[in-house]
Amino acid sequence: MKVTVLVRPKDGILDPQGEAIRHALDSLGYPIGQVRQGKVFDLEIDVETREQAEALANEAAERALANGVMERFEVVVA
């Protein structure tokens, strides 16, 4: 089963990469107010149900893919 895990900085956490991208876009004339850079993990999980896939992806995100102090994540089951 295909699962996507989206990892982003939590609100209020400094995002220097996002700020650098925002600055570059601004210098190119794009009126962007804020950019938050994150990570995307596309997983193929061998389970029977969507619920199992979501549970395993949540566990993997909490334990390995996201830093719970600085990042939040979202699991999307395809």
Residue spans for each PLM region:
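Long, contiguous binding/interaction regions
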Residues: 2-47, 52-78
